[in-house]
Every structure is written in C-alpha cells, then in structure tokens.
C-alpha cells in the first residue's frame, strides 16, 4: 500500500464502522435493506475498480459524506430521521425550522447531486475525455439522468412490495410532486457541485502554474 492509498482506505474503514453501527438495529430492517441496495452495489464496484480508476481525495471525501448521510436515512427511514431534534439540541431552539414534512430526504437528494458530481465528473473526464462545453454538461446530464432512474426504481419497488414497506421506501409523505421535487433538488445540487469542481480545477491550474514558474526561476 502506497502513501496515497491511506486516505481512501481510512475513509472506507470509517464508513464500515458507521455502516455496522447504524445497521445493527435499524428502525425498520426491511426498509434498511432496500435503502442499502445502492451501497451493496456501489461500494464493491468502487473497491474493485480502485486501481483502474482512482478518484481524487476530494471526490472520495464527497462520496464518504454522502454515504454516511444515506446510512443515517436508512437507519431511521428517511421520513423519520429526527433532524429537528438534533438541530434544536445544537442551537437551543427549533422555531425557525419548517413545520410539517420531514425534509431530511430532500436534503439528501440535494446532497446526492452535490456530493456525487465530483466523482461523476472525474469518471467521465477519465473515460470519455469530453472537450469544451461537453466536459461540464455531460456530468450534469449524467447526474440528472441517474436521479430520474432512481425515482423510477423507487416507484417500481413501492409497486412490488406495497403496504407499509412500499410507503416507507417511497417516502412521499403525502406530496404528489415528491419525485419531481427530489429530481429538481438533485439537479440543483449537481449544478452547485459543478461550480465547485470548476473552481477547484481553476485553483489547481493556477497552483500548478505558480509551481512551474517557481521551478523555472530557481
């Protein structure tokens, strides 16, 4: 193992501990299993293809944060995460928080676009090497299309399983426009993520130029 491998490995081990801790006694085991289909597929793929496609530490950090947020939602079910109580405990009051619907799932849909976008950008840049506007447009379209696919999978799972499990997994909380709002938030998160990636690329380019100039001067 090289020095560069230590950080991704540390994130993997920490996530493994979080996964086990939140998976020991989830509120609804069947919903936890459904919610974690994403993790059961994505994590082995990331580990298997680590050598052939290594993301930046920045992208791995974003993936780690998203997966932790997802595990919290899977532990409680997204519609029952006690986020209001947590914020109230930290800030001492919760009267400024929106009433009614539990918005944790909306927050994670936004986080999905924001935190997965860096890895999607690096994947597309490494495998397809798009140029010009397409270098930035393709990752955004990638995230938006996968958000649509996820909503379709949610709907199909709710149809197949039905009952309380289907309702818990779908998590609409009575909002007929829930899927559309989730997709819109994921798109907004991805757009913000794209802006952050562009800023990071510009900063890295400027830093590389400065190092080159310093080396040339020396």
Question: What residue ranges belong to the model's regions?
Answer:
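N-terminal membrane topogenic signal
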Residues: 1-13
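Short, hydrophobic transmembrane alpha-helix segments
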Residues: 21-33, 44-54
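Alpha-helical transmembrane segments of multi-pass membrane proteins
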Residues: 22, 63-73, 118, 142-154, ...
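Interfacial helix-loop-helix junctions of multi-pass membrane proteins
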Residues: 29-32, 104, 147-187
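Membrane-interface loop-to-helix entry segments
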Residues: 31-38, 99-120, 176-188
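Membrane-interfacial alpha-helical segments at the cytosolic side of multi-pass membrane proteins
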Residues: 41-50, 111-128, 159-163, 184-200
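Interfacial segments of alpha-helical transmembrane regions
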Residues: 44-68, 121-125, 129-146
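Extracytosolic (periplasmic/ER-lumenal) interhelical loops and adjacent juxtamembrane/interface segments
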Residues: 75-107, 156, 160-174
């Amino acid at each position: 193992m090289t020095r560069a491998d230590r950080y991704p490995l540390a994130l993997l081990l920490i996530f493994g501990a979080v996964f086990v801790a939140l998976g020991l006694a989830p509120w609804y085991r069947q919903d936890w299993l459904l919610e974690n289909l994403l993790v059961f597929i994505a994590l082995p793929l990331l580990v298997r293809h680590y050598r052939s496609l290594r993301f930046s530490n920045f992208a791995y950090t974003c993936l780690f944060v998203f997966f932790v947020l997802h595990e919290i939602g899977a532990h409680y079910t997204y519609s029952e995460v006690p986020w209001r109580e947590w914020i109230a405990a930290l800030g001492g009051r919760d009267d400024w928080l929106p009433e009614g619907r539990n918005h944790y799932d909306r927050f994670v849909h936004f986080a999905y676009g924001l935190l997965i976008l860096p890895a999607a950008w690096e994947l597309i840049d490494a495998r397809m090497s798009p140029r010009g506007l397409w270098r930035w447009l393709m990752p955004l379209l990638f995230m938006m299309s996968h958000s649509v696919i996820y909503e379709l999978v949610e709907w199909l799972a709710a149809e197949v399983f039905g009952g309380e499990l289907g309702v818990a997994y779908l998590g609409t909380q009575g909002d007929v426009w829930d899927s559309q709002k989730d997709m819109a938030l994921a798109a907004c998160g991805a757009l913000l993520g794209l802006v952050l990636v562009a800023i990071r690329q510009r900063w890295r380019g400027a830093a590389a130029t400065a190092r080159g100039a310093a080396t040339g001067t020396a």
